[in-house]
Structure formats: structure tokens, C-alpha cells
Amino acid sequence: MKLLAKAPLNLLRAFEAAGRTGAFALAASELELSPSAISHAIRKLENLLDVRLFQRSTREITLTKEGEILLEHIQRGFNELQQGLALVTADESRPLRLHTAPSFAHQWLLPRLGKFIRENPSIDLRLSASTEYARFEQDDFDLDIVYGEPRPSPYEKIPLAVEELTPLCSPQLAERLKKPEDLYALTLIQCDVQLYQWKGWFEANKMTPPNNYGLRFDRSFMAIAAAVDGLGVVLESKLLAEREIASGKLVCPLVNSTSEIHYIGHYLVFPQHQHMHSALDVFKTWLLNELNLGKIR
């Protein structure tokens, strides 16, 4: 306890945030402090412990070997502390705070949300969507549905459905799309933040990618909406476009004549201590069942 008395919690929080984010500025933004305050706190911690925790240069900071060891143990301790707080404050009315990728929320989750609410009327679900990663350390969120492979972290991650990317278009436009080569004469809609894009699809099908695309968006739900309106052919996930395909607003004209791209597009991420949150377990089970992944826990 003598060593712990040397290191106040505010200094440990500043160090943990800086070590995890790799930048004083990012840690400062997260903790709502100034970068100089973060730097001062870490310098004070180093002096108190008589250990150098960071190597500093004009452009970056990197953890020393001692810093890496301390960061691992502090994060483990914070998780234990969070778990203890959850145990003594457990409450049926505690909200479940979900963060998710925008297009997954808009295209897949929202159409099913009514079913979840009807089945679980006592759960206070609060939903937020952005392309940023959820912040668990400040207790902002309980779980996160992220697009793409999550960054390295101590959190649990569950891969969600294997998604299939295929050209999609309106039934009217499909009349002009009988073979893969017909794509060259049509407007191609591209989502610029997508992991796999038209170039990769053309190469997978041993075709030369075109030099230009007609429309570009930074969200899949906008690209899908443009295709529904007949503005072009979009390369998109059949999972995200499930509702439009089922209703006949979009069709897959080349699905039997081309090689499609398969990949794990989304992951469920949450801290281990959140196992103590009963509503999280209910939502996780429901989500996996809806994705036909009920055997994964």
C-alpha cells in the first residue's frame, strides 16, 4: 500500500490514457484536460516512482519496458475496480449503452430493434452511432459493434457474420446488366470507407478495374440508398442490404456468374467486467441469434 499511496488515482488515470492512446493530446481529450496537464501528471508519477515510463521525442512518445509492465497491471486493476463497482451498484434499471458503426445501425439493427424492445421491455437501451471506437474506460458505453478488425485492446471481441459483397442494383438497371462486362457501361457506386472496394472485386474476377467511378460516398447506407434510387450499381454487403433485397428494391444480377468477396465485416467488443451486466448478456444472446450465431458465447 505504500507504493499505492505514492501514486494518486488521477496520476494513474493520466498514465493509463496516455499509454493506451500513445499520445498526450489524445489522453488529454479523453480525460478533458490539457496536454500539458497530462504531461505534468506523468512526470510527477515518474518522479514519485523514480522510474521512467515514457521515451519522449519531438514527434511521439513510446512506453519504456517498465511503462509497458505498469500499463498492463493498471488496466487490469481498473477492470477489477469497474467490476466491483458494477457488483455493488447492480440495478435492473441500469441502462444498456450500445455504440455501433453507423451503417450497421441504420441497415441491420434498426429494422430489428422493435423486436428486441418487444421481447425485452424492461431494458433501457441507449444507442449511439459513429465511426469512432467506444470509450469503455470512462464508462461511456457498455459494448460496441465495430466495422473491421478491432484495434488491439484488452477487451473481448466476438466476430459477427461472414458478409458477402456482390454488385447490387435496382431491378430496372439489372435489365442492362446481364454479364460482368456490362458493368463498364454503367455508373458504379463506391463507398470509400469500405474494407473491400470495386478494384478488389474486379481483380478477384480477373477483370481490369475501371479508372473512374460515378458516385462515391463515405457511408454504406447512403450508397445503398443511391442504388435503390437507380443511380448505379453498388458493391455492398448482402447483410447490410438484406431488407432492400428481401423487398425487391435491389437485386443481385451477377451472383451466379462471378466470384464474390467474403469477409467478417463487424465485431462485437466489450470489457470483460461487463459480464456482470445482465442486460448486456441478454442483448448479446439476441444479437448472435439474429445473426444465426447462437452457438457463440
UniProtKB/Swiss-Prot annotation:
Gene3D superfamilies: Periplasmic binding protein-like II, Winged helix-like DNA-binding domain superfamily/Winged helix DNA-binding domain
One GO process term, biological-process aspect: DNA-templated transcription
Gene Ontology MF terms: DNA-binding transcription factor activity; identical protein binding; sequence-specific DNA binding
DNA-binding region: 24-44
Domain spans labelled HTH lysR-type: 7-64
Annotated keywords: DNA-binding, Transcription, Transcription regulation
Keyword Ligase: no
InterPro entries named among the record's database cross-references: LysR_subst-bd, Tscrpt_reg_HTH_LysR, WH-like_DNA-bd_sf, WH_DNA-bd_sf
Pfam families: HTH_1, LysR_substrate
Biological role stated in the UniProt entry: Apparent regulatory gene involved in peroxide resistance in stationary phase.
Stated family: Belongs to the LysR transcriptional regulatory family.
Protein name from the UniProt record: HTH-type transcriptional regulator PerR
Species of the source: Escherichia coli (strain K12)
